């Protein structure tokens, strides 16, 4: 019969005829056959199954073997023995390799045919050993899947006892070696199905023998924690996670995180690879285990691992959001990684450039699942932008993209952040620096945050962008000096010429830090700026003294510094008096003078004092009460003398009698340094010669320029704050003035006027007020509009007699140290004359982001003003200011500078502005500067720099001795150039080493992102270093299996 069958299958007869004859052969199996005939038939059918030329031959072999084995079971039992099966497994069958899946399929079917025979027990024992050997040989996924099918049907073949543990461990290793090289969907689905069969086998073994579970999991961790660069465990290991009981999470994570034998590098690798498991489709609970391990590492304060893993894998996790099968798990892990990474915005900024595209894509498909996902993503994004406020250039597109989705409340955001922090109060978070790459497209260099040094960085960038000041500093010949100015020159040179994206100002920080400033803690940028300018000023004065005492020692350091300051630093000024050669660089650039007048309202005597200033502190004032917004008759107010003006008593014979003409404004304000006594009655006073005042004009009118609260109809402007600053003040109540003529405390009027303007006007908005009820400093979050052009009233003081001849009436100014209620009387004369208005252009703005003075972040907006801006025409003073009421002279809304602001707005908008945010520098616009507080309520302008413009032609001439200054900075000294060249070479070497490290896939590559000079146990700050937005796309993401 075997000969007939063999000839039939190889014949050329039609297929229907062959099938009919095969059917007859199968039916003949019921007849008796001797043992030799049965063995011949079994040999033939085995050969057809394993070596059949086509599917028909293999099909015939299966049908005939099954029929003859069923009717001739003892003969088949004798044929399918241990020796035959062992030979198949170890040597194969003729031309069929032993690892061919057909061998396992044949054995699988053979076991089914002799299941009821006694000899099957011997085969089970044999297979328990052989399957372990096969698994140790790391079979391919398809063979391993067929083996899993066999062992699932015949659990008796699964190794027992100690061999069972070994078998599970080896099977885990085998899964770790699985790879799928195909990219076709059909092959990928088959691969996933094969891996699922193997993982299901392991699950069944774990259930049957629980003692095998823990060793299997240990083997999983050993595979994924391997630091061998030549081996990358397969992501197919993720298929095992869903079979691990969730009840074991706590025990396993504690064991892993506290085991001293587990090195940080191994733990980093393991965690990274577990995050890679998010790419595996159909895997459940991967996100649960990943988050549990992240929390476990945080609990034992292994923050270095968390920082490294987050920065390495945040892009991959975010990219998983594009795929529906793994999106829920990816979002859960992404949320935890971002919300717990609270010491630095670097991780969040890596994904920021890609959020808008993701949102737009999911909004366009319109699926309910996409909408629900976007709601969750929007909440996460709002939490991150709240925590890392101070990056408007990055966040504005995101806010626009998610504006239609609900925004969580501030209370909810705080709760989420508090619950997600690695520790509630951690002192072990490391300040992880940004990856340093080449300069940004702006061509500007950032400053690395050394640990809560954003207050210094923002000020230094503002000073660097003060073009005239920067050029004067760079032009100094300070070789041999070790002064603070030398260090500033070194810093400016690196900011201008380094190839690095960001520079670390460590040396300058240590030299310029005020002694009372605690390192790595939050500080006030305005306080730092004042200290810095004062240090530079006093240092130059000391050098002058040293130079004058050593005239015969040649050009030593002191003389060299003095020569450069006195000869090369020549800033044009119109103020007479002290020559420029006697001024320090700081005085020439930032120095101005204020003249204070105090008039006793009892005897009329006055005192005068002139003080130098480098900045003006502008206080806020609250909205006036409803009662104050009405006209008040002077008859209803306390009065001194109704007719006749009292002549002042001049104590100083060189000073002229002062005629006071109060402006028509009344203010009440309470600020951090200027606290006025509320409720004290306004006093009407006269300190001048008699003049006729019509009754209609003898009324007090609240100025239209009183700043409004945020809820009011108008927005406070810098001009409003200057109005308030320059308004006269009445000293009454507890703030009475001690008059030497009266020898007692008396009511008095205190005014202040600017007599000499600075080249760069620094304005500090006093945003931090002291809350007497709670004894804390609070921040004033009022929005303040910033004019591009500002006109400062300046009254020259070259000669008092000449002033009295030119101006018929003095203009009054207030003190900056005391804020008391003021009652001002309108002018009754037509001879009111305004001081000279000096135009200034906005140069830079330092912004504070935060809600208190003890926390937050500083960044700055700035632009280059080289002194060549002539895009505006000043309104002639004779036309716009002559015979104007004194109220207009105080920069009110009716003053000429308001018109200039409107004319300039569109023209100046197109000029380049830069946003300096620690190491990140980006292009921006003046529109962004104007809208910063309206878009981000915690971000408010704090320190402003205005550059003076010449009235003659709108430009300030450059130093005539330096012709190259016209279009650029002066050439650097050789010492500075050599230092920069050396550092640029070092930078190129660093880039090369980093490239090699990335190529070798070093496990500790991310550690290079942290500075060597800082301790990982230093406390974190809320204004850490930035990462520059990531960029570059998802080039590190591996191929997904879908």
Curated annotation (Swiss-Prot):
<dbReference type="GO" id="GO:0005737">
    <property type="term" value="C:cytoplasm"/>
</dbReference>
<comment type="similarity">
    <text>Belongs to the peptidase C19 family.</text>
</comment>
<dbReference type="InterPro" id="IPR038765">
    <property type="entry name" value="Papain-like_cys_pep_sf"/>
</dbReference>
<dbReference type="InterPro" id="IPR001394">
    <property type="entry name" value="Peptidase_C19_UCH"/>
</dbReference>
<keyword id="KW-0539">Nucleus</keyword>
<dbReference type="GO" id="GO:0005634">
    <property type="term" value="C:nucleus"/>
</dbReference>
<keyword id="KW-0645">Protease</keyword>
<keyword id="KW-0788">Thiol protease</keyword>
<dbReference type="Pfam" id="PF21246">
    <property type="entry name" value="Usp38-like_N"/>
</dbReference>
<dbReference type="GO" id="GO:0045824">
    <property type="term" value="P:negative regulation of innate immune response"/>
</dbReference>
<dbReference type="Pfam" id="PF00443">
    <property type="entry name" value="UCH"/>
</dbReference>
<keyword id="KW-0963">Cytoplasm</keyword>
<comment type="function">
    <text>Deubiquitinating enzyme that plays a role in various cellular processes, including DNA repair, cell cycle regulation, and immune response. Plays a role in the inhibition of type I interferon signaling by mediating the 'Lys-33' to 'Lys-48' ubiquitination transition of TBK1 leading to its degradation. Cleaves the ubiquitin chain from the histone demethylase LSD1/KDM1A and prevents it from degradation by the 26S proteasome, thus maintaining LSD1 protein level in cells. Plays a role in the DNA damage response by regulating the deacetylase activity of HDAC1.</text>
</comment>
<feature type="active site" description="Nucleophile">
    <location>
        <position position="454"/>
    </location>
</feature>
<keyword id="KW-0378">Hydrolase</keyword>
<dbReference type="GO" id="GO:0006511">
    <property type="term" value="P:ubiquitin-dependent protein catabolic process"/>
</dbReference>
<comment type="subunit">
    <text>Interacts with isoform 1 of FBXW7; this interaction prevents FBXW7-mediated degradation of MYC.</text>
</comment>
<dbReference type="InterPro" id="IPR049407">
    <property type="entry name" value="Usp38-like_N"/>
</dbReference>
<protein>
    <recommendedName>
        <fullName>Ubiquitin carboxyl-terminal hydrolase 38</fullName>
        <ecNumber>3.4.19.12</ecNumber>
    </recommendedName>
</protein>
<dbReference type="InterPro" id="IPR028889">
    <property type="entry name" value="USP_dom"/>
</dbReference>
<feature type="active site" description="Proton acceptor">
    <location>
        <position position="857"/>
    </location>
</feature>
<keyword id="KW-0833">Ubl conjugation pathway</keyword>
<dbReference type="InterPro" id="IPR033840">
    <property type="entry name" value="USP38"/>
</dbReference>
<dbReference type="GO" id="GO:0032435">
    <property type="term" value="P:negative regulation of proteasomal ubiquitin-dependent protein catabolic process"/>
</dbReference>
<dbReference type="GO" id="GO:0140311">
    <property type="term" value="F:protein sequestering activity"/>
</dbReference>
<dbReference type="InterPro" id="IPR018200">
    <property type="entry name" value="USP_CS"/>
</dbReference>
<dbReference type="GO" id="GO:0004843">
    <property type="term" value="F:cysteine-type deubiquitinase activity"/>
</dbReference>
<dbReference type="GO" id="GO:1990168">
    <property type="term" value="P:protein K33-linked deubiquitination"/>
</dbReference>
<dbReference type="InterPro" id="IPR050164">
    <property type="entry name" value="Peptidase_C19"/>
</dbReference>
<feature type="domain" description="USP">
    <location>
        <begin position="445"/>
        <end position="949"/>
    </location>
</feature>
